[in-house]
């Protein structure tokens, strides 16, 4: 939990930076009466995403892997982990709308989580993307996805509590 101690190890640098930004905004409010809002979006996806397999996030990486597997004529797709981890995603344009709303309605740097409050397991996400890209069908999905359980799942669960956003925005 970012606000109640040191962040989870794989997210520590990012988490500490978020905590520092919040503290800075709080200090500016106290010292200069500066108005601000502090929005923390969940995992984003959308147009102009990063599809570089070395640095992309899960949705664009899976899309690219499926497309490249089809281009090569591969019979299966290898995916890290077991698929049991869950994530929450937000379309980038919805995030932009949320940021604008926060700027219009808030004047306090109280952290606001911006998300959908809906989780999807990586397994279900892989199945969805494989079907939408045409890599697999409902009938072939189980045979076409191979899970490499020797690779990490990452943090077991990431889903934000968006109740404060609903209340204040």
Question: Where are these predicted regions, by residue range?
Answer:
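Catalytic helix-loop patch of NAD(P)-dependent Rossmann-fold dehydrogenases
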Residues: 1-45, 49-54
